[in-house]
């Protein structure tokens, strides 16, 4: 067997999904940072998003950095049914699960941190539980964006958790998250050009602070 034959195939995303909730009352909340990430990609790549009833979400496609075709999706099913929308796209285009990259919020990561992985559990995130159920596997890449924990909250304080994830960032946090989203675009562009595993080395090693420009 040649050395080339033993090299693992690069995982290159073909569909990028941002998780969130529809309705204006959820706009710019911490739980909707996945939506914000896909919107940032849409602006950067000049791919317009439009509501697609068949896909139960806002959908767009175009050419991404690296020259390949890329699809963007914001499920409009509400968070805990996100998998329905994702499955509608993957079934229509016959995309394998490993070609789907899902972006979502993570309270266990501090603000300014991101984590890119090739697979994993839902980690208690209802949107990811739905995605895993509808894709029938955990083996697809995901990018978690840290939103931090509510200040001074006990781990079992569910009401505080809900108000935190459905709350909005402060002015200073918004500035920081703007930089985080720029970094997310860079990480995803690297994953499209060199594969998710290569992008992990960059995405997982930095903390984005307000001092960066």
From Swiss-Prot:
PROSITE patterns according to UniProt: PEPT_TRNA_HYDROL_1 (PS01195)
Entry keywords, A to Z: Cytoplasm, Hydrolase, RNA-binding, tRNA-binding
Active site: 31
Primary enzyme class: hydrolase
InterPro entries per the UniProt record, alphabetical: Pept_tRNA_hydro, Pept_tRNA_hydro_CS, Pept_tRNA_hydro_sf
Subcellular location: Cytoplasm
BP-aspect Gene Ontology terms: protein quality control for misfolded or incompletely synthesized proteins; rescue of stalled ribosome
Quaternary structure and interacting proteins, as annotated: Monomer.
UniProt-listed PANTHER family: PEPTIDYL-TRNA HYDROLASE
Protein function: Hydrolyzes ribosome-free peptidyl-tRNAs (with 1 or more amino acids incorporated), which drop off the ribosome during protein synthesis, or as a result of ribosome stalling.
Protein name per UniProt: Peptidyl-tRNA hydrolase
Organism listed in the record: Nostoc punctiforme (strain ATCC 29133 / PCC 73102)
Gene name, Swiss-Prot/TrEMBL: pth
């Amino acid at each position: 067997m040649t050395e080339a034959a033993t090299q693992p195939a690069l995982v290159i995303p073909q569909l990028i999904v941002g998780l969130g909730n529809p309705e204006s009352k959820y706009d710019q909340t911490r739980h909707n940072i996945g939506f914000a990430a896909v919107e940032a990609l849409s602006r950067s790549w000049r791919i317009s998003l439009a509501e697609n009833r068949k896909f139960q979400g806002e959908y767009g496609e175009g050419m991404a950095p690296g020259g390949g075709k890329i699809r963007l999706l914001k499920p409009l099913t509400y968070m805990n049914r996100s998998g329905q929308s994702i499955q509608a796209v993957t079934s229509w285009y016959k995309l394998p699960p490993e070609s789907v990259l899902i972006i979502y919020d993570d309270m266990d990561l501090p603000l300014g941190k991101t984590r890119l992985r090739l697979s994993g559990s839902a980690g208690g995130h209802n949107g990811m539980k739905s995605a895993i159920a509808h894709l029938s596997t955990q083996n697809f890449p995901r990018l978690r964006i840290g939103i931090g924990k509510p200040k001074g909250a006990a781990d079992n304080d569910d009401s505080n958790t809900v108000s935190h994830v459905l709350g909005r960032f402060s002015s200073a946090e918004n500035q920081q998250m703007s930089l985080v989203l720029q970094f997310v675009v860079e990480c995803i562009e690297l994953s499209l050009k060199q594969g998710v595993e290569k992008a992990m080395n960059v995405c997982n090693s930095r903390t984005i602070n307000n001092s960066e420009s």
